[in-house]
Amino acid sequence: MYRHLIASISFATLIAAACWAAAPAAAPPAAPAAAPPAMPIPSAPQVDARSYILVDYQTDKILAAKEATARMEPASLTKLMTAYIVFQELAGGKLKLEDMVTVSEHAWRSEGSRTFIELGKPVSVQDLILGMIVQSGNDATIALAERIAGTEDTFAQLMNSNAKRLNMVGTHFENSSGLPSPQHYTTARDMSLLANAMIRDFPQYYKYYSIREFEHNGIKQQNRNGLLEKDPSVDGLKPATPIPPASVSSPRRIARACAWCRWCSDPPA
């Protein structure tokens, strides 16, 4: 279901001919060869999804889509915006990978997926980033949000201002990790805009999304993006589970990167 591929194929046909007659007068030029018929554009694939979009990163052209502006629950795809802001802070010199962050009770008590950071213990920004991206740890994500903005509520305001700047018109964030909330929503189109901005603005940090595993506190966890193992053309970004199961990935075909965002019809069994 994840491996529907869309590729563009270009080709050129070159025909060259020269003819000289034995007589002094030159033969008239041959009529130009007829241009080959245009390649038909394939129809969009049948995908078991409520909403999806496939966008060419280089041109921002939408290659295929279904209900791409329908409002969806982002779940842990929210962490893409949190990471985007963390990378902003790093690039601007306001944050360093070696900075230490003391884990608050709010971060430590967070629900859902965890990096298993310890209450009151300092953790490096580097390890928190790995915990957020590789393990999808809500605790690591909230710790980073609090380090940048003081509180998670204030950080959500920063998320929404960035969403507005990126023209994510169908998105509103209420927290940094993606825990359910009535006014916490996005669209497949908006997530494709965020994915493209991530790759474009912070290529030096995008490598985090291809790391396969991370160990913290003696607990080793695999990257939750199973496409890294299943498809060698996928170089990163994020799945989201459990409800609704969704993903944002960056497959590369013929040296071309695409942003692929989808929400499944039903949660996995």
Where are the language model's segments positioned?
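Non-catalytic interaction/Regulatory regions outside core domains
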Residues: T13, A22-A23, A240
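Active-site-adjacent loops and short helices of periplasmic peptidoglycan-processing enzymes
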Residues: A23-R189, N196-R200
